[in-house]
Amino acid sequence: MAALDRVKVLVLGDSGVGKSSLVHLLCHNQVLGNPSWTVGCSVDVRIHDYKEGTPEEKTYYIELWDVGGSVGSATSVKSTRAVFYNSLNGIILVHDLTNKKSSQNLYRWSLEALNRDVAPTGVLVTNGDYDREQFADNQIPLLVIGTKLDQIPETKRNEVLTRTAFLAEDFNAEEINLDCTNPRYLAAGSSNAVKLSRFFDKVIEKRYFFKRWQSRFLASRKERDLEEEH
Amino acid sequence: MSFLIDSSIMVTSQVLFFGFGWLFFMRKLFKDYEEYQDAILQTYQDTILSSLIPLAYFLHCSSRYFHWKLNLCVILLILVFMVPFYIGYFVVSNIRLLHRQKLLFACVLWLTFMYFFWKLGDPFPILSPKHGILSIEQLISRVGVIGVTLMALLSGFGAVNCPYTYMSYFLRNVTDADILALERRLLQTMDMIISKKKRIAVAHRTMFQRGEVHNKPTGFWGMIKSVTTSVAGSENLSLIQQEVDALEELSRQLFLETADLHATKERIEYSKTFQGKYFNFLGYFFSIYCVWKIFMATINIVFDRVGKTDPVTRGIEITVNYLGIQFDVKFWSQHISFILVGIIIVTSIRGLLITLTKFFYAISSSKSSNVIVLLLAQIMGMYFVSSVLLIRMSMPLEYRTIITEVLGELQFNFYHRWFDVIFLVSALSSILFLYLAHKQAPEKHMAL
C-alpha cells in the first residue's frame, strides 16, 4: 500500500482508560479478551465505507494508532512518542468516565499531538495551557470517547454525561460514551455508530476531498460564530 | 514542665514533617490520579509521623526515653497490624469476584501475613526465651530483619548505581543520526504491521461476505465447498497473524531502545551543564566511598569482626594522636557524629523516596495505586526502624546505651553481620548486572 492511501487516526488517552479494548472493538467488532499494557504503539486497521449507501461509496482503510503511556512522562519518552504523531489525519481522545483526571488530561494529550504536527502557518501554543481559540481553528477532526459507562451508577449518570458534553464542546468534537466490553453500543444503526461513521467520513474527506471538506468546515464555523453572537 | 516543652516540640516538629510528607504525596505521587481514599492518606501520614525518631536527638531531657518508646509502639502497631490489613483489603477489592466478602478475605490475607511474619523469626538467632510472645522485642526483631535486608539491598544497589549514573565516563555516545536511524526502522516496522493487518482485514471481510452468500440454503455440497475454500484461506491467515505478532514484538523492542537513546542523549546534554559537571565530580568521590564500603564489608565478614568505636571518634582520635592538635574529643565527637548521622539519614531517605517514586511511576495504574501507596508506607516504616538499629554503630558509647535501652535486648551484632552480607551480595550482583547491561547496549547498535 503506497503512503498516499493512508488515513491515520491517533487514539490518545491515559493509561488504563481502555484504548486497546476500544481499538479492538472498532476493528474486529469483538471484545478484547486479555487486555494488557501497551508498550510503545499498537496499530490496527478498520475498513470503512466512505459515504455508505450512496452512489459515491468507496472503501478506505483507516489506521488506528494506539499510543500508550501517560501524559506526565519524562521528556525523553515524550520525544520518543512524538515519532508516531507524524502526518496524522484525525484524533480519537479516550477518557475514563469513572476518573475525572483522565478527562482533564485530554487537553494535555491533544496539545502534545497537535503541537507536534503543526503546519508552518499553524497556531503555536508556547506555554502548554489550554486555549479555546486554538481548538476552534484546529483543522484536524477530533472525537471524544468516554469508556466504562457500565461502571457509573444510574444516579450519577446525568451529572457525568453533562460534564462530558462540556468537554466535547471544548474540543469542538462529537462525543460517544460506551462500554468497551459490550459490542451492543456500536451496533449498526445506533446513534453511536452513526457518529463514528460521520467522524471517519470527516477524516477521509479532509484527507482526500479537501475542497468539499473546506467549504463544509467554513460553513460550520460561520454557524458557530453566529450562535456565539446571540 | 520540661516534659511539656519537650512534648510540644515533638508535636510541632511532627506536624511540620507531616506537612512535608503531605506535599510530597500530593505533588509527586498522585499528580495524575484522582482515585484515592482518605483512609490511605491517614495511614500514610501516621507512618511518616511516627517515623520521626531521629528528632529525639534534639531533646536533652529524660522525657526523651518516653517519647522514643511511644513512637516505637505506634510505628510497630501500624506496621504490623494496620498497613498489612489495608493492603489485603485493597488487593481483594481489586479482584472483582470476591467483592461480596471483602472483609472476610482481607482478614484471611492478614492472618497469612502474620503467620509468615512469625515464621520469619525461626531461622535467625534472635529469639531469646525470656520474653513473652507479644513483647516489643519479638516484633522489633522481625521487623528489623526485613528492614535490614531491604536497607542492605538498596544500599548495595545504590552504592554501585550512583557512580554509574553520575559519572559521564560511562555515558555512551549517542548522535542524532543514531536516533533518526532507529526511528526510521521503527516506522518501517509499523508500516509492515499495517500492510499485513490490511490483508487480514480484507480476507476477513471477503470471507464474511462470502459466508453470507453461502448461508443461503444451497444444500450439502455448498457447505462442503465453503469449508474447503475457507480452510485454505484461514491457514494463510494464521501464518500472516504469526508474522504480525513477531513484528509487533519487534516494534516494542525498537520503541524501548529509542526511548533509551533519547534518555541517554538528554543525559549527555545535562552533563555539559554546570550541574552536570558538579555531579560528575561527586561521582568520583562516591565511587571511592563505595569501593571502600565494599572492602570494609568483605573484611568484616572474613575476619569476623564488629567495630567497637564509631568512625568519627576514631577519626578525631587519629587526628589528635598524629597531628597533635588539641581537641576536646568527647565534646566534638558528640556533635559531629550527630550532624553526620543526620546527613546520612536525610540523604538515605531522599534516595529511598526517589527510587520508590521512579518505581511507583513505572508500575502504577489507576487500579493499583492504592496498594502501591500502602506498600510504600510499609517499606518506609520498616526502613526507618531498621535504620535506627544500624545507626547505633556510628554513635558514641553513651548514646548507644540509650538505644539499647529503648529497643530492648536484641542481638545487634547479628544485624550488623547480616547487613554486611546482604550489602556485599547486592553490590556484587548489581555490578554484574550493570556490566552486562552496559556491554549489551553498544552491541545492539553495532548491528544497525
UniProtKB/Swiss-Prot annotation, chain A:
Residues 1-230 are annotated as: Small GTPase-like. The keyword GTP-binding applies. Coiled coil: none annotated. SUPFAM superfamilies: P-loop containing nucleoside triphosphate hydrolases. InterPro entries: P-loop_NTPase, Sigma_54_int_dom_ATP-bd_1. Keywords: GTP-binding, Nucleotide-binding. GTP binds at residues 16-21, 148-150, 179-180. GO terms for cellular component: endomembrane system. One of its GO terms (molecular function) is protein homodimerization activity. It holds the Pfam family Roc. GO terms for biological process: B cell differentiation; intracellular protein transport; natural killer cell differentiation; regulation of protein lipidation; regulation of Ras protein signal transduction; T cell differentiation in thymus. Belongs to the small GTPase superfamily. Rab family. Required for KRAS signaling regulation and modulation of cell proliferation. Regulator of KRAS prenylation, and probably prenylation of other small GTPases. Required for lymphocyte development and function. Not required for myeloid cell development. Homodimer. This is Rab-like protein 3. It comes from Gallus gallus. The gene is RABL3.
